């Protein structure tokens, strides 16, 4: 079970985090999974023998589950050891406002802190959900502001970050790119250009795909 993407939606996300736009385009089958895009975040050696690309959203509950169950081990076991080049690609599944704002915040934090921001937002989903309907994240603004401050951004810098037209355009392009790669839900992983099945949404799913490649 993953969070699905409606590829034909064209929406304007207003309200809790006003001024954030989201556009989604149609789907094609021209995968470009190993090419670094302007909206991507990456970790590890660029020339590592294995490239793992994850399409995810900070507002996707299943992504948050896998983030806790797999990613710390994955980073330590494969990325930090030089075996894997990891690319994270943002998708706008889940609450669109929070997804856009969260990913823009990660970009504004800089490459050294981007993954810290992604992790912090995913771990704060339940807190953002307090006081409102499920997955509406009515408490998102104070939580995201706090996370911004934890990586050295003021509230004013945070506000400018999540409403920056250039940043929003980058997010739109990243979203379009994911759809062109045939991604229809999150989380989705490609390993050396091949989409892998997810069954348990923990480290075993990644181990099962990566270990055979390391033995070649």
Predicted features and spans:
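Functionally engaged cysteine thiol sites
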Residues: 47, 108, 161-164
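Residue-level recognition of short, well-ordered coil/turn positions
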Residues: 20, 82-83, 113, 166, ...
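C-terminal cap of thioredoxin/glutaredoxin-like
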Residues: 2-9, 29-33, 57, 145-216
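Structural alpha/beta surface segment adjacent to cysteine/selenocysteine redox centers
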Residues: 58, 65-149
């Amino acid at each position: 079970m993953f969070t699905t993407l409606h590829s034909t939606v064209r929406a304007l996300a207003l309200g809790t985090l006003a001024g954030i736009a989201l556009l989604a385009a149609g789907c094609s089958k021209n995968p470009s999974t190993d090419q670094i895009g302007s909206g991507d975040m990456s970790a590890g050696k660029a020339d590592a023998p294995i490239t793992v690309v994850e399409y995810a959203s900070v507002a996707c509950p299943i992504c948050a589950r896998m983030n806790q169950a797999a990613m710390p081990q994955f980073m330590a076991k494969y990325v930090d050891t030089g075996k894997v080049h990891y690319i994270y690609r943002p998708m706008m599944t889940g609450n669109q406002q929070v997804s856009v704002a969260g990913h823009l915040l990660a970009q504004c934090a800089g490459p050294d802190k981007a993954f810290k921001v992604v992790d912090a937002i995913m771990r704060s989903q339940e807190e953002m959900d307090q006081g409102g309907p499920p997955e509406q994240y009515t408490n998102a603004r104070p939580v995201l502001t706090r996370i911004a401050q934890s990586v050295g951004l003021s509230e004013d810098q945070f506000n400018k970050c999540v409403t920056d037209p250039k940043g929003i355009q980058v997010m739109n392009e990243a979203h379009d790119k994911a759809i062109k790669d045939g991604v229809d839900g999150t989380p989705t992983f490609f390993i050396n250009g091949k989409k892998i099945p997810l069954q348990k949404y923990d480290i075993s799913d990644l181990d099962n795909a990566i270990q055979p490649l390391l033995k070649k």
